[in-house]
Protein backbone atom coordinates (compact mmCIF):
# COMPACT_ATOMS: atom_id res chain seq x y z
CA UNK A 1 0.00 0.00 0.00
CA UNK A 2 1.06 3.62 -0.52
CA UNK A 3 0.11 6.79 1.26
CA UNK A 4 0.77 10.32 0.19
CA UNK A 5 1.42 12.39 3.28
CA UNK A 6 1.11 16.15 2.67
CA UNK A 7 0.57 17.07 6.28
CA UNK A 8 3.27 19.65 6.72
CA UNK A 9 6.58 20.21 5.02
CA UNK A 10 9.45 18.33 3.42
CA UNK A 11 12.34 20.18 5.10
CA UNK A 12 12.89 17.72 7.97
CA UNK A 13 13.01 14.81 5.51
CA UNK A 14 15.66 16.52 3.38
CA UNK A 15 17.90 18.03 6.05
CA UNK A 16 19.89 15.46 8.01
CA UNK A 17 20.17 17.68 11.06
CA UNK A 18 17.37 20.19 11.33
CA UNK A 19 16.85 22.65 14.19
CA UNK A 20 13.60 22.24 16.08
CA UNK A 21 12.61 25.84 15.47
CA UNK A 22 8.97 24.74 15.31
CA UNK A 23 7.12 21.70 16.59
CA UNK A 24 5.88 20.75 13.12
CA UNK A 25 9.38 19.83 11.92
CA UNK A 26 9.66 16.91 14.31
CA UNK A 27 5.94 16.15 14.11
CA UNK A 28 5.98 15.69 10.34
CA UNK A 29 8.68 13.02 10.56
CA UNK A 30 7.02 11.32 13.50
CA UNK A 31 3.65 11.21 11.77
CA UNK A 32 5.21 9.65 8.68
CA UNK A 33 7.01 7.10 10.86
CA UNK A 34 3.83 6.08 12.66
CA UNK A 35 1.87 5.72 9.43
CA UNK A 36 4.68 3.53 8.11
CA UNK A 37 4.33 1.18 11.08
CA UNK A 38 0.81 0.36 9.88
CA UNK A 39 2.13 -1.16 6.67
CA UNK A 40 2.05 1.86 4.39
CA UNK A 41 4.80 3.17 2.15
CA UNK A 42 4.87 6.88 2.90
CA UNK A 43 5.47 9.65 0.39
CA UNK A 44 5.70 13.27 1.52
CA UNK A 45 4.79 16.42 -0.40
CA UNK A 46 4.95 19.98 0.90
CA UNK A 47 1.41 21.27 1.29
CA UNK A 48 2.37 24.49 -0.53
CA UNK A 49 3.58 22.63 -3.62
CA UNK A 50 0.72 22.98 -6.09
CA UNK A 51 2.76 21.55 -8.99
CA UNK A 52 3.88 18.26 -7.50
CA UNK A 53 4.27 15.56 -10.15
CA UNK A 54 2.82 12.44 -8.56
CA UNK A 55 4.03 9.04 -9.76
CA UNK A 56 1.72 6.71 -7.85
CA UNK A 57 -1.87 6.14 -6.89
CA UNK A 58 -2.57 6.01 -3.19
CA UNK A 59 -4.62 4.07 -0.67
CA UNK A 60 -4.67 6.90 1.88
CA UNK A 61 -4.18 10.63 1.74
CA UNK A 62 -3.56 12.73 4.84
CA UNK A 63 -3.42 16.44 4.21
CA UNK A 64 -4.19 19.97 5.20
CA UNK A 65 -7.42 21.19 3.69
CA UNK A 66 -8.50 22.96 1.62
CA UNK A 67 -4.97 23.33 0.21
CA UNK A 68 -3.50 19.92 0.81
CA UNK A 69 -5.81 17.41 -0.83
CA UNK A 70 -6.96 18.53 -4.28
CA UNK A 71 -3.73 17.68 -6.12
CA UNK A 72 -4.35 14.00 -5.30
CA UNK A 73 -7.80 13.79 -6.86
CA UNK A 74 -6.58 11.82 -9.89
CA UNK A 75 -4.14 9.70 -7.89
CA UNK A 76 -6.42 7.87 -5.49
CA UNK A 77 -7.04 4.16 -5.73
CA UNK A 78 -10.64 2.93 -5.36
CA UNK A 79 -11.53 3.09 -1.67
CA UNK A 80 -8.71 5.53 -0.91
CA UNK A 81 -9.04 6.86 2.63
CA UNK A 82 -9.03 10.63 2.96
CA UNK A 83 -8.04 12.23 6.26
CA UNK A 84 -8.28 15.97 6.81
CA UNK A 85 -5.57 17.39 9.05
CA UNK A 86 -6.87 20.50 10.81
CA UNK A 87 -4.17 22.54 12.54
CA UNK A 88 -6.28 25.61 13.26
CA UNK A 89 -9.82 26.71 13.83
CA UNK A 90 -12.22 26.72 10.88
CA UNK A 91 -10.68 29.06 8.30
CA UNK A 92 -13.96 30.93 7.92
CA UNK A 93 -13.93 31.68 11.65
CA UNK A 94 -10.21 32.47 11.61
CA UNK A 95 -10.64 34.92 8.74
CA UNK A 96 -13.68 36.52 10.34
CA UNK A 97 -11.97 36.90 13.72
CA UNK A 98 -8.94 38.53 12.15
CA UNK A 99 -11.18 40.95 10.25
CA UNK A 100 -12.83 41.97 13.53
CA UNK A 101 -9.39 42.67 15.02
CA UNK A 102 -8.36 44.73 11.98
CA UNK A 103 -11.62 46.69 12.05
CA UNK A 104 -11.16 47.43 15.76
CA UNK A 105 -7.63 48.62 15.07
CA UNK A 106 -8.92 50.91 12.33
CA UNK A 107 -11.44 52.39 14.75
CA UNK A 108 -8.74 53.01 17.37
CA UNK A 109 -5.98 54.41 15.17
CA UNK A 110 -7.55 55.23 11.80
CA UNK A 111 -5.22 52.87 9.92
CA UNK A 112 -6.17 49.90 7.75
CA UNK A 113 -3.64 47.07 7.88
CA UNK A 114 -3.51 43.99 5.67
CA UNK A 115 -4.81 40.61 6.86
CA UNK A 116 -2.06 38.05 7.41
CA UNK A 117 -3.60 34.84 8.73
CA UNK A 118 -7.00 34.72 7.07
CA UNK A 119 -7.76 32.96 3.80
CA UNK A 120 -10.06 33.54 0.85
CA UNK A 121 -10.17 29.77 0.42
CA UNK A 122 -12.27 28.14 3.10
CA UNK A 123 -13.27 24.59 3.92
CA UNK A 124 -16.45 23.48 2.19
CA UNK A 125 -18.99 20.73 2.62
CA UNK A 126 -16.60 18.26 0.97
CA UNK A 127 -15.04 17.65 4.37
CA UNK A 128 -18.22 15.79 5.33
CA UNK A 129 -17.28 13.10 2.77
CA UNK A 130 -13.86 12.45 4.27
CA UNK A 131 -13.15 9.23 6.15
CA UNK A 132 -11.74 11.05 9.15
CA UNK A 133 -10.46 14.30 10.56
CA UNK A 134 -7.49 14.91 12.83
CA UNK A 135 -7.46 18.21 14.65
CA UNK A 136 -4.98 20.09 16.81
CA UNK A 137 -6.67 22.05 19.57
CA UNK A 138 -9.32 21.43 22.17
CA UNK A 139 -13.09 21.01 22.06
CA UNK A 140 -13.65 24.76 22.19
CA UNK A 141 -11.67 25.28 18.98
CA UNK A 142 -13.07 22.17 17.32
CA UNK A 143 -16.57 23.59 17.81
CA UNK A 144 -15.68 26.07 15.07
CA UNK A 145 -16.43 23.17 12.69
CA UNK A 146 -19.95 22.65 14.05
CA UNK A 147 -21.40 24.02 10.81
CA UNK A 148 -20.35 20.74 9.18
CA UNK A 149 -21.44 17.16 9.73
CA UNK A 150 -17.92 16.10 10.54
CA UNK A 151 -16.53 12.62 9.82
CA UNK A 152 -15.09 10.61 12.74
CA UNK A 153 -12.72 13.12 14.34
CA UNK A 154 -9.71 12.62 16.58
CA UNK A 155 -7.64 15.08 18.57
CA UNK A 156 -3.93 15.33 17.85
CA UNK A 157 -1.95 16.61 20.84
CA UNK A 158 0.50 19.39 20.04
CA UNK A 159 3.95 18.92 21.57
CA UNK A 160 6.19 21.06 23.73
CA UNK A 161 9.85 20.60 24.58
CA UNK A 162 11.99 19.03 27.29
CA UNK A 163 14.58 21.77 27.70
CA UNK A 164 17.33 20.44 29.94
CA UNK A 165 18.16 24.00 30.99
CA UNK A 166 14.63 25.04 31.98
CA UNK A 167 14.23 26.22 35.56
CA UNK A 168 11.04 26.29 37.59
CA UNK A 169 12.26 27.31 41.03
CA UNK A 170 13.88 30.65 40.24
CA UNK A 171 12.78 34.17 41.05
CA UNK A 172 11.75 35.91 37.86
CA UNK A 173 10.54 39.48 37.47
CA UNK A 174 6.77 39.35 37.99
CA UNK A 175 6.39 42.47 35.84
CA UNK A 176 8.23 41.04 32.83
CA UNK A 177 6.18 39.52 30.03
CA UNK A 178 7.05 38.00 26.67
CA UNK A 179 4.98 38.03 23.49
CA UNK A 180 6.19 34.98 21.58
CA UNK A 181 4.60 34.37 18.18
CA UNK A 182 5.25 34.18 14.45
CA UNK A 183 3.29 36.02 11.76
CA UNK A 184 0.04 37.94 11.90
CA UNK A 185 0.75 40.49 14.61
CA UNK A 186 -2.79 41.89 14.79
CA UNK A 187 -4.22 38.38 14.60
CA UNK A 188 -2.03 37.40 17.55
CA UNK A 189 -2.88 40.55 19.53
CA UNK A 190 0.47 42.33 19.51
CA UNK A 191 -1.21 45.64 18.66
CA UNK A 192 -3.24 45.40 21.86
CA UNK A 193 -0.17 44.68 23.97
CA UNK A 194 1.94 47.44 22.45
CA UNK A 195 -0.77 49.99 23.13
CA UNK A 196 -1.31 48.75 26.67
CA UNK A 197 2.34 48.51 27.69
CA UNK A 198 3.27 51.85 26.11
CA UNK A 199 0.35 53.78 27.58
CA UNK A 200 -0.99 52.08 30.69
CA UNK A 201 1.64 49.57 31.85
CA UNK A 202 4.78 51.70 31.73
CA UNK A 203 6.31 50.10 34.82
CA UNK A 204 6.01 46.64 33.22
CA UNK A 205 8.35 45.15 30.61
CA UNK A 206 7.26 43.46 27.38
CA UNK A 207 9.72 41.44 25.27
CA UNK A 208 8.44 41.15 21.70
CA UNK A 209 9.64 37.97 19.97
CA UNK A 210 7.88 37.67 16.61
CA UNK A 211 8.09 38.42 12.90
CA UNK A 212 6.79 41.99 13.11
CA UNK A 213 9.62 43.26 10.90
CA UNK A 214 8.26 41.22 7.98
CA UNK A 215 4.89 43.01 8.14
CA UNK A 216 5.76 46.42 6.76
CA UNK A 217 2.44 48.14 7.43
CA UNK A 218 2.37 46.95 11.04
CA UNK A 219 6.06 47.73 11.47
CA UNK A 220 5.57 51.32 10.33
CA UNK A 221 2.40 51.89 12.37
CA UNK A 222 3.89 50.60 15.62
CA UNK A 223 7.49 51.73 15.12
CA UNK A 224 7.28 54.22 17.98
CA UNK A 225 5.91 51.67 20.44
CA UNK A 226 8.51 49.11 19.39
CA UNK A 227 11.60 51.30 19.24
CA UNK A 228 10.90 54.44 21.23
CA UNK A 229 9.31 52.98 24.35
CA UNK A 230 11.75 52.10 27.12
CA UNK A 231 9.72 49.25 28.62
CA UNK A 232 9.11 47.45 25.31
CA UNK A 233 12.05 45.36 24.08
CA UNK A 234 11.85 44.45 20.36
CA UNK A 235 13.63 41.13 19.82
CA UNK A 236 12.34 40.05 16.40
CA UNK A 237 12.63 36.35 15.59
CA UNK A 238 14.23 34.44 18.45
CA UNK A 239 15.60 30.93 17.95
CA UNK A 240 14.35 28.73 20.80
CA UNK A 241 17.70 26.94 20.82
CA UNK A 242 19.59 30.18 21.40
CA UNK A 243 21.07 31.66 24.54
CA UNK A 244 18.84 34.69 23.94
CA UNK A 245 15.68 32.64 24.38
CA UNK A 246 17.11 31.03 27.49
CA UNK A 247 17.90 34.42 29.00
CA UNK A 248 14.41 35.71 28.24
CA UNK A 249 12.88 32.67 29.92
CA UNK A 250 14.91 33.37 33.07
CA UNK A 251 13.76 37.00 33.16
CA UNK A 252 10.09 36.79 32.18
CA UNK A 253 7.50 35.33 34.50
CA UNK A 254 4.67 35.36 31.97
CA UNK A 255 4.09 34.59 28.29
CA UNK A 256 1.07 36.46 26.96
CA UNK A 257 -0.83 35.73 23.74
CA UNK A 258 -4.26 37.34 23.16
CA UNK A 259 -4.72 35.64 19.78
CA UNK A 260 -8.05 35.62 17.94
CA UNK A 261 -7.74 32.09 16.48
CA UNK A 262 -5.39 29.13 16.88
CA UNK A 263 -5.34 25.36 16.95
CA UNK A 264 -3.20 24.79 20.03
CA UNK A 265 -0.65 27.60 20.25
CA UNK A 266 2.79 26.03 19.87
CA UNK A 267 4.58 29.18 20.98
CA UNK A 268 2.79 29.00 24.31
CA UNK A 269 3.80 25.36 24.76
CA UNK A 270 7.37 26.43 24.06
CA UNK A 271 7.16 29.15 26.70
CA UNK A 272 5.60 26.75 29.20
CA UNK A 273 8.38 24.25 28.51
CA UNK A 274 10.82 26.96 29.57
CA UNK A 275 8.99 27.64 32.83
CA UNK A 276 6.93 30.69 31.90
CA UNK A 277 3.32 31.11 33.01
CA UNK A 278 0.83 31.50 30.14
CA UNK A 279 -1.85 34.19 29.99
CA UNK A 280 -3.77 33.53 26.80
CA UNK A 281 -7.05 33.91 24.96
CA UNK A 282 -9.35 30.90 25.03
CA UNK A 283 -8.80 30.64 21.27
CA UNK A 284 -5.26 29.44 21.98
CA UNK A 285 -6.66 25.96 22.60
CA UNK A 286 -5.94 25.21 26.26
CA UNK A 287 -8.05 24.13 29.21
CA UNK A 288 -8.61 26.25 32.29
CA UNK A 289 -6.45 23.98 34.46
CA UNK A 290 -3.52 24.32 32.05
CA UNK A 291 -3.19 28.08 31.54
CA UNK A 292 -4.63 31.40 32.65
CA UNK A 293 -7.40 31.87 30.11
CA UNK A 294 -8.59 35.39 29.40
CA UNK A 295 -12.41 35.60 29.28
CA UNK A 296 -12.06 38.02 26.35
CA UNK A 297 -9.41 40.19 24.74
CA UNK A 298 -10.75 43.62 25.57
CA UNK A 299 -8.05 46.10 26.55
CA UNK A 300 -9.40 46.47 30.07
CA UNK A 301 -9.52 42.69 30.54
CA UNK A 302 -5.91 42.18 29.48
CA UNK A 303 -4.83 45.11 31.65
CA UNK A 304 -6.62 43.67 34.66
CA UNK A 305 -5.09 40.22 34.27
CA UNK A 306 -1.58 41.59 33.80
CA UNK A 307 -1.83 43.65 36.97
CA UNK A 308 -3.59 40.96 39.02
CA UNK A 309 -1.16 38.14 38.30
CA UNK A 310 1.94 40.30 38.51
CA UNK A 311 1.02 40.95 42.15
CA UNK A 312 1.14 37.27 43.13
CA UNK A 313 3.84 36.39 45.63
CA UNK A 314 6.98 34.51 44.59
CA UNK A 315 5.81 31.25 46.13
CA UNK A 316 2.66 31.31 43.99
CA UNK A 317 4.63 32.24 40.88
CA UNK A 318 7.19 29.47 41.37
CA UNK A 319 4.42 26.90 41.85
CA UNK A 320 2.67 28.17 38.72
CA UNK A 321 5.90 27.92 36.72
CA UNK A 322 6.37 24.36 37.96
CA UNK A 323 2.76 23.59 37.00
CA UNK A 324 3.36 24.90 33.46
CA UNK A 325 6.30 22.56 32.98
CA UNK A 326 4.40 19.63 34.48
CA UNK A 327 1.46 20.21 32.13
CA UNK A 328 3.77 20.05 29.12
CA UNK A 329 5.41 16.88 30.43
CA UNK A 330 2.16 15.09 31.27
CA UNK A 331 -0.14 16.28 28.46
CA UNK A 332 1.94 17.78 25.65
CA UNK A 333 5.14 15.76 25.45
CA UNK A 334 6.45 14.21 22.25
CA UNK A 335 5.22 10.87 23.55
CA UNK A 336 1.73 12.33 24.00
CA UNK A 337 1.81 13.54 20.40
CA UNK A 338 2.87 10.12 19.14
CA UNK A 339 0.19 8.31 21.12
CA UNK A 340 -2.49 10.68 19.84
CA UNK A 341 -1.45 10.09 16.21
CA UNK A 342 -1.48 6.33 16.73
CA UNK A 343 -4.94 6.52 18.30
CA UNK A 344 -6.25 8.77 15.52
CA UNK A 345 -4.85 6.60 12.74
CA UNK A 346 -6.15 3.38 14.26
CA UNK A 347 -9.51 5.06 14.85
CA UNK A 348 -9.92 5.94 11.18
CA UNK A 349 -8.78 2.50 10.06
CA UNK A 350 -11.20 0.80 12.46
CA UNK A 351 -14.12 2.91 11.24
CA UNK A 352 -13.49 2.05 7.60
CA UNK A 353 -13.18 -1.72 7.85
Where are these regions (language model features)?
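A charged, aromatic-enriched C-terminal amphipathic alpha-helix characteristic of glycosyltransferases
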Residues: 23-26, 311-346, 352
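Short, small-residue-biased leader/transition segments that mark boundaries at the very start
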Residues: 1-3
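Aromatic "clamp/platform" in nucleotide-sugar-dependent glycosyltransferases that forms part
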Residues: 260
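A short, active-site helix/loop in glycosyltransferases that binds the activated sugar's phosphate group
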Residues: 113-153, 162, 217
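Conserved donor-binding/catalytic core segment of Leloir-type glycosyltransferases
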Residues: 165-188, 194-201, 207
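Short hydrophobic beta-strand element within catalytic cores of glycosyltransferases
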Residues: 276-280
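Nucleotide-activated donor-binding/catalytic signature segment of Leloir-type glycosyltransferases, i.e.
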Residues: 219-239
Amino acid sequence: MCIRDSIYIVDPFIEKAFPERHQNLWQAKEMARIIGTRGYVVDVVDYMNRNAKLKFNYDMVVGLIPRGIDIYTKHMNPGCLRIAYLTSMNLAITTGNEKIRLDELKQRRGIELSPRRGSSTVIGKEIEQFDGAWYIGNKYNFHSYDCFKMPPSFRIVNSGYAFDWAKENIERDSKSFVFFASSGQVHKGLDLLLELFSQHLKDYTLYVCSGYEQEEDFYQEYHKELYETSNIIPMGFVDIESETFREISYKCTFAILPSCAEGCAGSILTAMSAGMIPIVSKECGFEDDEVINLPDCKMETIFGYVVEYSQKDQNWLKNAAKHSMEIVHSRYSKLCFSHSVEKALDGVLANTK
